[in-house]
Amino acid sequence: MSHFDRVRDYLTALQDRICNVVETIDGQSHFHQDHWQRTEGGGGRTRLLRDGAVFEQAAIGFSDVCGTHLPPSASVRRPELAGANWRACGVSLVFHPKNPFVPTTHLNVRYFRAEREGKQVAAWFGGGFDLTPFYPFDEDVVHWHTVARDLCAPFGDERYAAHKRWCDEYFVLRHRNETRGVGGLFFDDLDKDFERDFDYQRAVGDGFLDAYFPIVTRRHDTPYGDRERAFQLYRRGRYVEFNLLFDRGTLFGLQSGGRAESILISLPPLVRWEYGYHPLPGSAEARLADYLLPRDWLEESRICE
């Protein structure tokens, strides 16, 4: 089996596993699947769960697409690949829970291959996961980063620190001077050794289940009211801003002629903006600002023990 087919099989199975867990936790709604084909080559399956007991919207898509010319969002970083044939597969998800005390989350794991005259000229892995709470709990953030650190451990002492830092630097709303959330892991252009890099991608994909769903289980029954709901919708606006202005995957998908419905399914179903909003000093809403900057969560928790 080719390298590409092995990755593809893992990713389709990962999508199935995550969907099963989400449906079990939600207990009310189910995913609806949309198979689609891309005129330029390839296709995918988009799955969407809406109006659940736990998840207001949970979107997870698998795609396997190809083309004859790299879009600008990719070739600007790899100018030597301009004009090469390419093929990419990946799983991407964004979950928007109903309860404001359950964080929004994002996962992406992908594999990219470029060929010229029938010969592979480049191939690499990319991906990661990150967490966007509205009412953060230190316990949850430490759990999230503990899972991230532990899954990175077999790949070297520097892996967690490097990919956490990359995540902190990537998921930044520069016009707001704040991070999108409390970070996680981010990596791209991983191309040193296929077997080891593929092992890492699987560790990230598998680790996501251990990192996120215990938080959901812990928080989804937390009581909330109109105030918390309004703040959740306001903060979702930041999510929209990042995805439309800065996210490489969104830009790549749209510039490569991707399926807009599947690409933009990451956006929340409801959102609000408010001009000049500032939370009351000392409020639970104001506390969020302390979390929207790079921090060494595990070291801080160790010191506090």
Curated annotation (Swiss-Prot):
Cofactors named for this entry: a divalent metal cation
GO terms classed as biological process: protoporphyrinogen IX biosynthetic process
Predominant subcellular localization, coarse grouping: cytoplasm
Site, as annotated: Important for dimerization: H175
The keyword Phosphoprotein is annotated on this UniProt entry: no
Residues binding a divalent metal cation: H96, H106, H145, H175
Top EC category: oxidoreductase
Oligomeric form and interacting partners: Homodimer.
NCBIfam families per UniProt: PRK05330.1
Protein name as catalogued: Oxygen-dependent coproporphyrinogen-III oxidase
Organism: Xylella fastidiosa (strain Temecula1 / ATCC 700964)
Lineage: Bacteria, Pseudomonadati, Pseudomonadota, Gammaproteobacteria, Lysobacterales
